[in-house]
Amino acid sequence: MTTDNTNTTRNDSLVARTDTWLQSLLVWSPGQRDIIKTVALVLMVLDHANRILHLDQSWMFLAGRGAFPLFALVWGLNLSRHAHIRQLAINRLWGWAVFSQFWYYFAGFPWYEGNILFAFAVAAQVLTWCETRSGWRTAAAILMMALWGPLSGTSYGIAGLLMLAVSHRLYRAEDRMERLVLVACLLAVIPALNLATSDAAAVAGLVMTVLTVGLVSCAGKLLSRFWPGDFFPTFYACHLAVLGVLAL
């Protein structure tokens, strides 16, 4: 009995230490969040420039696999500041997604494929509806995901929604074991985002994400936020417009 209790205590201690270490890696100051968003923006521009300008550079494509997971993690952390996802913020996100769609098409993407802002908007809307525990809203959430699936071929599809949902839940989880399970899910979902493309893309996405998170967690803890609130969606639309013009 004593041995069993000792083993249980050791296991609990290991879980606690692991959880503390993971929180030091995954919980960032406002300045660190902006650093991660900046890295993600650079990776996104490299990826889009490579595709839109037909540069055909493998390293640019592989580096770009880290952009979406980084944005998703920051998004999940930002949402955790509020008890519930605010519908006003979701509406603003829908607006930016609709505005950016023209520039997405202008840059050379199929008109019927939704841009990545739609993935964030769909995920936020689905999560909000599911939180209400209303039958018709749950049905609406399922319908929205079903409709989004065929339109999300260039925006990570259902795997992208899963990545966003796990990121959202990770920063709201209060139980240590739940957080560890969610981190394990992240380590599986991040490669899954690009597994259909190639094994190299799947590995690159995970490596770029882990490397960025590891480096940023060691610096910038006292740095204040330096990007305005709507900088990302504004930059997203503008960079598509610029790349579209360059591709003419």
Curated annotation (Swiss-Prot):
InterPro entries, A to Z: TraX, TraX_Ftype
A Pfam short name: TraX
Membrane topology (UniProt): Multi-pass membrane protein
Transmembrane segments: 39-55, 180-196, 200-216, 232-248
Main subcellular location of this protein, as a coarse class: membrane
One annotated Gene Ontology cellular component of this protein: plasma membrane
UniProt entry tagged with the keyword Membrane: yes
Localization annotation: Cell membrane
Entry keyword Kinase: no
The entry's keywords: Cell membrane, Membrane, Plasmid, Transmembrane, Transmembrane helix
NCBIfam families: PRK13706.1 (NF010260), TraX_Ftype (TIGR02755)
Functional description taken from the UniProt entry: Responsible for the N-terminal acetylation of F pilin.
Record-stated family: Belongs to the TraX family.
Protein name, per record: Protein TraX
Higher taxonomy: Bacteria, Pseudomonadati, Pseudomonadota, Gammaproteobacteria, Enterobacterales
